Design a protein with these regions (language model features):
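Short, flexible loop segments at the rims of nucleotide/cofactor-binding pockets, characterized by
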Residues: 31-36, 55, 103-108, 134-135
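Non-catalytic C-terminal accessory region of glycerolipid acyltransferases
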Residues: 2-28, 45, 71-75, 95, ...
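Catalytic core of membrane glycerolipid acyltransferases/transacylases, capturing the structured
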Residues: 52-107
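A short, well-structured juxtamembrane/interface segment
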Residues: 28-53, 62-65
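Generic structural signal for residues in well-ordered beta-strands
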Residues: 36-38, 100, 186
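Conserved beta-strand termini and adjacent loop/short-helix elements that scaffold enzyme active sites
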Residues: 39-41, 80, 103-106, 189, ...
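Short, well-ordered turn and helix-capping elements at secondary-structure junctions
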Residues: 40-42, 60, 104, 133, ...
Length: 228
């Protein structure tokens, strides 16, 4: 009789191999066959011009759009630690030009957080984080990005993205994958700065409000009813 644990382990190994090997080419096809629009990118350029480190924040459901729209820039990104999907993201990210830090709030979080702080102490660092990832709850910021910004003086630039043609996969959120031959819009929001004296509740509310409003705008732009 087959051992279910061994079967799951073999399945996970196959998925990691398949995703890491073919994922970059598949994502390039899905996303590079779309027309791209970048809205209000001056917000990001202004943040870069400030000389301070930057945290790019987006909801988890838009991860792939932000991931592909900002690839090839040698930016940093955060993936989970020991989950197969995190390993796939890490391998794909490396091939697409991202420098991936492994860890999450529940798995290797302290080590990853300290590494993020070290990276953000470099003034030219750009680090992408999904504040509600990797396991939700959806659209509720966890402390990591906010605390890191407070500790290092990093500017948080909210970003939302959506495609006019897409698939949606519902789990704890609705995770979007662009279909080929549509139009993808990546929209940047007004940068946020949080002092160390600011309460987490106030910072969290400000970040959530910004990301929710940005998501609603980009969804309206591509003709998608917001799932807020």
């Amino acid at each position: 009789m087959a051992n279910p644990k061994n079967e799951k382990r073999l399945k996970n190994r196959f998925l990691v191999w398949f995703g890491g090997t073919f994922g970059p080419s598949l994502l390039r096809f899905f996303y590079n066959t779309n027309k791209w629009e970048f809205k209000d990118r001056y917000h990001f350029k202004d943040a870069v011009s400030s000389g301070r480190p930057i945290i790019i924040a987006s909801w988890h459901n838009a991860l792939l759009t932000v991931f592909m729209g900002l690839s090839k820039n040698n930016y940093y990104g955060l993936a989970g630690n020991h989950h197969p999907d995190a390993e796939i993201i890490s391998r794909i990210g490396a091939k697409l030009g991202w420098k991936v830090v492994r860890g999450s709030s529940t798995d290797g979080g302290k080590k990853a957080y300290n590494e993020i702080l070290e990276i953000l102490r470099s003034k030219d660092a750009v680090f992408a984080i999904t504040p509600d990832g990797p396991q939700g709850p959806a659209k509720i910021p966890k402390p990591g990005a906010i605390r890191a910004a407070q500790r290092t003086g990093a500017i948080i630039v909210p970003v939302a993205g959506q495609s006019s043609k897409r698939w949606g996969f519902t789990n704890w959120d609705t995770f979007y994958l662009a279909k080929p031959f549509g139009t993808i819009t990546l929209m940047f929001g007004k940068p946020l700065s949080f002092s160390e004296e600011s309460s987490f509740e106030d910072c969290s509310n400000a970040l959530k409000k910004s990301l929710d409003q940005l998501e609603e705008r980009v969804n309206q732009h591509v003709g998608l009813v917001s799932d807020n």
